[in-house]
């Protein structure tokens, strides 16, 4: 058997902007942050529409299906402020996400805006 050399690392200096999808990308799925957010989205729909839990949940999933995101449905149908929605539904317990200094350093070392 011959030993293979590591793959060549391409320069990333041409990248000017980075966008990171946080959900299960920069933290492990086991943190289960989405379940907290999902419950808060349902609560938000309940507040905006004055519906009970089951009806709000059904509407939430319908907006997701019909508009691509629940937020888009709420904006189109209820004139919801997206900043208020995002701040509200992301006010969760982040303690399941453990510190990962190597990841922080790797992202900091990337060129461009993050």
PLM features: what roles do these ranges have?
Residues 2-3:
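A charged helix-plus-loop insertion that forms the helical arch/lid used to bind
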Residues 6-20, 25-104:
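N-terminal helical cap/lid subdomain that shapes the substrate entry/recognition surface
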Residues 80, 112-113:
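A structural micro-motif
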Residues 95, 113-114:
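A general structural signal for well-ordered secondary-structure junctions
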Residues 102-112:
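Catalytic-core regions built around general acid/base machinery
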């Amino acid at each position: 058997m011959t030993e293979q050399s590591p793959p060549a690392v391409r320069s990333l200096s041409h990248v000017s902007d980075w966008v990171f999808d946080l959900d299960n990308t920069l933290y492990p799925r086991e943190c289960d942050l989405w379940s907290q957010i999902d419950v808060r989205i349902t609560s938000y729909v309940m507040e905006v529409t004055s519906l009970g839990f089951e009806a709000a949940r059904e509407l939430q999933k319908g907006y997701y299906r019909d508009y691509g995101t629940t937020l888009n449905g709420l904006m189109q149908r209820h004139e919801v402020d997206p900043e208020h929605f995002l701040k509200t539904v992301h006010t969760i317990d982040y303690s399941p996400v453990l510190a990962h200094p190597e990841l922080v350093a790797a992202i900091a070392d990337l060129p461009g805006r993050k």
